[in-house]
Amino acid sequence: MKAYLDLLSHVLNNGTDRSDRTGVGTRSVFGYQMRFNLQEGFPLLTTKKLHLRSIIYELLWFLKGDTNIAWLKEHGVSIWDEWADKDGNLGPVYGYQWRSWPSSDGRYIDQISNLLAMINHNPNSRRLIVTAWNPALIDEMALPPCHCLFQFQVANGKLSCQLYQRSADIFLGVPFNIASYALLTMMIAQVTGLKVGDFIHTLGDAHLYSNHFEQAKQQLSRTPGILPLIRINPKVTDLFSFQFEDFELLNYEAQPHIKAPVAV
């Protein structure tokens, strides 16, 4: 994951110090891109241990169209707790926009199902896009979408994905986002009969919170290891039928976790 460490180093050494919504303060750059060849391994950080369980359950939760944290908490995942209201609701966040985008004529658009249909029937389309950025509903969301738009391309029998992330917490959030969208690409490739290509991660405001500087330096002092592999149950042919048990992480040798506070 040299590409990720290069990002950390670039922001730490070349970023601009700015104030932000949380009051913590950040060092940021505007516009940055990383590329990962998914045939070379699963892009899960080895320079600090990540909680893959949370990544998988969050992705399955998005795909369910759920926007309440109850299901996540049932499975021991707490990454959305800080933003939920007393009933566990988050408003019309990712899952709602992915699966039930409300149209002006009263319909609800299932962007994920539409995406799968287009990949299967018109793989050369340049419209293989899903967006979570709905301006009409931003104010109703507990947190506006950070990873807000992704696009797929099919070429030479391979499926590639590019994510645009408007706001990127590079120490805590970005490693999760890389793994999540890489896994989503692998899942969609499997159910559409394709091989995996690249995951391209394009960042808008790429920032390191001021209380993450020392943790970033600690991580940069570590040498990355060989990427792990992830085995997906080959019997699953429906994207919405995947369960946590359908994923097996292989050969993951990571250095110890590095704690850092979440900016809310």
Curated annotation (Swiss-Prot):
Pathway: Pyrimidine metabolism; dTTP biosynthesis. DUMP binds at R21, R126, R127, R166, S167, A168, D169, N177, H207, L208, Y209. Keywords: Cytoplasm, Methyltransferase, Nucleotide biosynthesis, Transferase. The active site is at C146 (nucleophile). PROSITE patterns: THYMIDYLATE_SYNTHASE. The keyword Cytoplasm applies. GO terms for cellular component: cytosol. Its EC number is 2.1.1.45. (6R)-5,10-methylene-5,6,7,8-tetrahydrofolate binds at H51, D169, A263. GO terms for molecular function: thymidylate synthase activity. It is found in: Cytoplasm. Gene3D superfamilies: Thymidylate synthase/dCMP hydroxymethylase domain (3.30.572.10). It catalyses: dUMP + (6R)-5,10-methylene-5,6,7,8-tetrahydrofolate = 7,8-dihydrofolate + dTMP. Belongs to the thymidylate synthase family. Bacterial-type ThyA subfamily. Catalyzes the reductive methylation of 2'-deoxyuridine-5'-monophosphate (dUMP) to 2'-deoxythymidine-5'-monophosphate (dTMP) while utilizing 5,10-methylenetetrahydrofolate (mTHF) as the methyl donor and reductant in the reaction, yielding dihydrofolate (DHF) as a by-product. This enzymatic reaction provides an intracellular de novo source of dTMP, an essential precursor for DNA biosynthesis. Homodimer. This is Thymidylate synthase. It comes from Bartonella bacilliformis (strain ATCC 35685 / KC583 / Herrer 020/F12,63).
